[in-house]
Amino acid sequence: MKLNFAATALLIGIFTLGLFCPAAVTAAPRVKHVFIISFDQGNPDLIQKSAMPVLHELAATGARTWSAYTVVPSITLPAHTSMLTGVGPQAHQVLWNDYIPSNGLVKIPTIFSLAKEHGLVTAMFVGKEKFKHLLLPGSVDAFVWPHPESDAKAVAKAFAAQVATLKPNLCLIHFLDPDTAGHKYGAQSPEKMRALADCDAALKIVRDAIAAAGLAGSSVIILTADHGSHDIINPAGKSVGTHNTAETEDVKIPWVAWGQGVKKNFTITAPVLQYDTAATALWLLHLPLPDYFWGRPVTSAFK
């Protein structure tokens, strides 16, 4: 059967539209909200042994690996920068670990700035001032550092007070307590385990606030850490926690996903690296991954 010219042109037009029209190929986001919760110095082995019923429930009913890996240097600011830019320290060049205003801001886009390019709402609730180095102009709608009370409970309460109004599409929540306790009392100390338990109570505040805001059914929560730690004996002869090496105790971190579209009771066997969190967040929100990204979405964790 022969097609006339008009019919042929129509078919070609439909085919071309399907291939090349952005409106035709742009899919809806897999979720509307991604909450990344980072436990500073969150050794996965200690987390599994600590009194953390909320986190353990999310891990058991979601997807998890207790053997994800962070970057080197395994310290807070470089690691979180990788978590939020999708590249390693060699690329983002944030190699310091204090708030040093003269060092300026990260030189490459964060996932917050990429999200803002697509009109999304972004937020950061953090326990340390050094995160200001990641505040690219116009990239974060709400940045909250509840100084001087910046422990996990204070951060969680600040989040709970604003989440229903903000309804952020992309949000980082950072709990500093394990790092504080680990450095002072030891990487595996009872004090650090209590700090992790305090973080779990804060996690409950966050989870309940997400639900109360009506966002639970359209959200994914990612639970992870910047680094682990190990013990050393300080000059006073006391065992204290430290990190910043490539040793397993310092670089192994947890990675848990829970929420809409996450596989139930699933063990992630594929390798997960620190910068994969950035890629996973963009993938969930159906935002394009930059070509320069090192990270790749942890797609195996999702249905």
Kindly give the residue locations of the regions a language model identified.
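Active-site His/acidic residue clusters
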Residues: 133-140, 160-201, 205
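Boundary at the C-terminal end of the N-terminal hydrophobic targeting segment
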Residues: 23-27
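Substrate-binding rim/cap in mid-to-C-terminal beta-strand-loop elements of soluble/periplasmic
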Residues: 84, 242-286, 299-302
